[in-house]
């Protein structure tokens, strides 16, 4: 059988009686994304050691309606979470009588580019810290407030608001920070480890089958640069660790806890795979 680069015969995976069909390839669109007059980098030269020559935003793999919705801030439902996050930013909570703004003033200035640099190394906890965990650390240590429960409305909204201040900024983590490189290695191992009853790894869909269709979903590289993301199929915002857990659930494997060592290592590695792509939060996906 002759196999071309673009058109491949359907591939079937059968595990435990479940058949998954990976159908013919379809190239990502050749379009430019501009949000609020800010050009987004949706194609970026991959860093050394990356499996692809080019990092590709998931926006390039979505249907026209989804792409158009993200490009229009007035139409993007995820902007409601950003607006809610702005309210929380200025709301006093906790025994210290402080809000986020009490220490950080105008987020447009103090949080500019911050979302493109996380995860970072937390020397106190001796592990990586992401935006959500940094919010909780500030709430507990500086505000005297309770940490958010995972995926609480306030946590997702405030994370969206903070990351939105980096809209258009290319993702760039510093792997020389603390022990991040070691966690990158752990995350890479997890990314390629097959698990669950379906015996799938992250790489099974987002590397080996990137560009193919599984059911009606055009498989992308699984980039993290748009999270938290508004998803049409859930009708709401989805955090990165929610998405990780959802993918793991779909392989019929036991789900790790959010912000566990496993998922923090995975976040470090997956974020690195999107080096150079613009922060799109809140991205819109199907």
Swiss-Prot record:
Stated induction or repression of this protein's expression: By thiosulfate.
Cofactor(s) required, per the database record? heme
From the UniProt record, list the reaction(s) this protein catalyses. Answer: L-cysteinyl-[SoxY protein] + thiosulfate + 2 Fe(III)-[cytochrome c] = S-sulfosulfanyl-L-cysteinyl-[SoxY protein] + 2 Fe(II)-[cytochrome c] + 2 H(+); S-sulfanyl-L-cysteinyl-[SoxY protein] + thiosulfate + 2 Fe(III)-[cytochrome c] = S-(2-sulfodisulfanyl)-L-cysteinyl-[SoxY protein] + 2 Fe(II)-[cytochrome c] + 2 H(+)
Cite the active-site annotation: 247
The record lists heme 2 as bound by: 202, 205-206, 247
- GO-annotated biological processes: sulfur oxidation
Keyword Transcription set for record: no
Residues that hold substrate according to the record: 243
Its main localization is: periplasm
Q: Which Pfam families does the entry mention? A: SoxA-TsdA_cyt-c (PF21342)
**What Gene3D superfamilies does the annotation carry?**
Cytochrome c-like domain (1.10.760.10)
Q: Which residues of the sequence carry a binding annotation for heme 1?
A: 100, 103-104, 138
Name the top EC class.
transferase
The UniProt GO MF terms for this protein read: electron transfer activity; heme binding; metal ion binding; oxidoreductase activity; oxidoreductase activity, acting on a sulfur group of donors, cytochrome as acceptor; transferase activity
Q: InterPro entries attached here? A: Cyt_c-like_dom (IPR009056), Cyt_c-like_dom_sf (IPR036909), SoxA (IPR025710)
- List GO terms (cellular component aspect): cytochrome complex; periplasmic space
After translation, how is this protein modified? Cysteine persulfide at Cys-247.
Q: What is its EC number?
A: 2.8.5.2
Summarize subunit and interaction data from the UniProt record for this chain.
Answer: Heterodimer of SoxA and SoxX.
Give the similarity note: Belongs to the SoxA family.
Q: Under which name does UniProt file this protein?
A: L-cysteine S-thiosulfotransferase subunit SoxA
Q: What is the lineage of its organism?
A: Bacteria, Pseudomonadati, Pseudomonadota, Alphaproteobacteria, Hyphomicrobiales
């Amino acid at each position: 059988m002759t196999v071309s680069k673009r058109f491949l015969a359907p591939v079937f995976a059968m595990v435990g009686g479940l058949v998954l069909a990976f159908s013919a390839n379809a190239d990502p669109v050749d379009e430019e994304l501009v949000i609020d007059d800010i050009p987004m980098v949706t194609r970026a030269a991959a860093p050394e050691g990356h499996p692809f020559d080019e990092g590709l935003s998931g926006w390039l793999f979505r249907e026209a309606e989804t792409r158009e919705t993200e490009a229009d801030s007035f139409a993007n439902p995820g902007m409601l979470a950003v607006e809610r996050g702005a309210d929380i930013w200025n709301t006093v909570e906790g025994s210290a009588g402080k809000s986020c703004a009490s220490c950080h003033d105008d987020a447009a200035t103090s949080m500019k580019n911050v979302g493109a640099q996380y995860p970072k190394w937390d020397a106190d906890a001796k592990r990586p810290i992401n935006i959500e965990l940094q919010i909780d650390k500030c709430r507990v240590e500086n505000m005297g407030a309770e940490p958010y429960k995972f995926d609480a409305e306030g946590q997702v909204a405030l994370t969206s608001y903070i990351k939105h201040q980096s809209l258009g900024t290319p993702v760039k983590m510093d792997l020389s920070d603390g022990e991040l490189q070691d966690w990158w290695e752990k995350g890479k191992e997890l990314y390629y480890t097959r698990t669950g009853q379906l015996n799938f790894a992250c790489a099974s869909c987002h590397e080996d089958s990137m560009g193919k269709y599984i059911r009606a979903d055009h498989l992308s590289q699984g980039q993290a640069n748009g999270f938290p993301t508004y998803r049409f199929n859930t009708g709401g915002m989805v955090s990165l660790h929610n998405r990780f857990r959802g993918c793991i659930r779909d392989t019929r494997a036991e789900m790790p806890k959010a912000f566990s060592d496993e998922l923090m290592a995975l976040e470090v590695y997956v974020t690195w795979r999107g080096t150079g792509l613009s922060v799109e939060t809140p991205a819109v996906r199907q």
